[in-house]
């Protein structure tokens, strides 16, 4: 396929998976990066830099491994479980590609290029107040002013935004674990694996290198596909596979997410055979990458769907089907988070 991940992305993926020569050559730069990060954390810990506490509890969902690990599905799951616990949650986010200093509300009708694809997906799926902007504290303050009913805030990413005080930190990893365990740029980590947090969540793997044994397992489950131009029209993923002597349709699976292999693996687990198109993360779909694709069915992620709907040519392409995924986690995590928010501890 013409539109594929860059050679640099592939190189970094391979480099960060092992402690090879290329990674070793970058260790001096990683030492500088790590030292500066440690000084910044120490400044907040010692009170030299001030963290601002908001009038409602704050839960931060983030990762220290660069790239996608599944934060958005986890954030949507948290919105639902907190709502079930009696809270009225709101979500704040940086918003990929957002350059506006003024906090901006996100609705399902917002443009992805103005608010970011992940916040747009959260607004669409979670049906709660969502705002984006570069300054998390300003965004949170604006959201609370616009929605005084909100009594807990979820920060989609923002783990390193220390100026915003938080009550709960959830750090998410996937099957890549900690990679080679080194900090950027020699490795994939923004901070050491040993950094303090309240909960560690592992997405889509029974175990991963370099992670604590008490990590809470998360699975992304997707069993159906929905027509992009009519999401009331659904079909089981298994219906796209060959069966009873019938030939399966030719399928293209496309993903512009941080870890497209996870999406492709989900489709394979449903028994599908397909050609892969791994697009760059946050691919904007301003141009139609499927215009010259000869396939009967094109399966895409929800994150890509919010952008495809805003391109008329893609919106009218009847071959496009969206595969929604839902996070499944141990219910004990929800209980522990709620207890922590209420100021009580669990033995």
UniProtKB/Swiss-Prot annotation:
Name used for this protein in its record: Tetraacyldisaccharide 4'-kinase
Pfam families for the chain: LpxK
Function: Transfers the gamma-phosphate of ATP to the 4'-position of a tetraacyldisaccharide 1-phosphate intermediate (termed DS-1-P) to form tetraacyldisaccharide 1,4'-bis-phosphate (lipid IVA).
UniProt gene name: lpxK
GO BP: lipid A biosynthetic process; lipopolysaccharide core region biosynthetic process
Family listed: Belongs to the LpxK family.
Uppermost EC category: transferase
Domain of life per record: Bacteria
Pathways per UniProt: Glycolipid biosynthesis; lipid IV(A) biosynthesis; lipid IV(A) from (3R)-3-hydroxytetradecanoyl-[acyl-carrier-protein] and UDP-N-acetyl-alpha-D-glucosamine: step 6/6
Reactions the enzyme catalyzes: a lipid A disaccharide + ATP = a lipid IVA + ADP + H(+)
EC number: 2.7.1.130
Chain sites annotated for binding ATP: 65-72
Keywords per UniProt: ATP-binding, Kinase, Lipid A biosynthesis, Lipid biosynthesis, Lipid metabolism, Nucleotide-binding, Transferase
Alphabetized InterPro entries for the sequence: LpxK, P-loop_NTPase
Molecular functions per Gene Ontology: ATP binding; tetraacyldisaccharide 4'-kinase activity
């Amino acid at each position: 396929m013409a539109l594929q991940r860059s050679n640099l992305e592939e190189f970094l993926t391979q480099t960060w998976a092992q402690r090879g020569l290329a990674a070793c050559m970058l260790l001096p730069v990683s030492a500088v990066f790590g030292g500066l990060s440690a000084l910044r954390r120490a400044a907040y810990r010692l009170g030299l830099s001030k963290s601002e506490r908001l009038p409602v509890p704050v839960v931060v969902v983030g990762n220290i491994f660069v790239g996608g690990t599944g934060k958005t599905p986890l954030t949507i799951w948290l919105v639902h479980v907190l709502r079930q616990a009696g809270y009225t949650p709101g979500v704040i986010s940086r918003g990929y590609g957002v350059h506006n200093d003024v906090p901006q509300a996100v609705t399902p009708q917002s443009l992805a290029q103005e608010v970011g694809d992940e916040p747009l997906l959260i607004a669409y799926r979670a049906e709660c107040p969502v705002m984006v902007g570069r300054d998390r504290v300003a965004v949170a303050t604006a959201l609370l002013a616009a929605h005084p009913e909100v009594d807990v805030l979820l920060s989609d990413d923002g783990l390193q935004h220390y100026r915003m005080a938080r009550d709960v930190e959830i750090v998410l990893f996937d099957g890549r674990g900690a990679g080679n365990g080194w900090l950027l740029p020699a490795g994939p980590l923004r901070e050491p694996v040993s950094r303090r947090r309240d909960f560690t969540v592992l997405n889509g793997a029974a175990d991963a290198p370099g992670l604590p044994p008490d990590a809470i397992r998360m699975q992304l489950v997707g069993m159906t596909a929905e027509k992009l131009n009519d999401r009331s029209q659904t079909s089981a993923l298994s219906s796209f596979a060959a069966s009873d002597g019938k030939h399966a349709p030719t399928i293209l699976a496309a993903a512009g997410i941080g870890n497209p292999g996870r999406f492709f693996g989900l489709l394979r687990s449903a028994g599908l055979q397909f050609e892969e198109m791994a697009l760059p993360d946050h691919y904007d779909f301003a141009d139609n990458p499927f215009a010259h694709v000869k396939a009967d069915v094109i399966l895409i992620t929800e994150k890509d769907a919010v952008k495809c709907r805003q391109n008329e040519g893609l919106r009218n392409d009847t071959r496009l089907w969206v595969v929604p995924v839902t996070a499944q986690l141990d219910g004990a995590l929800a209980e522990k988070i709620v207890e922590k928010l209420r100021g009580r501890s669990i033995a």
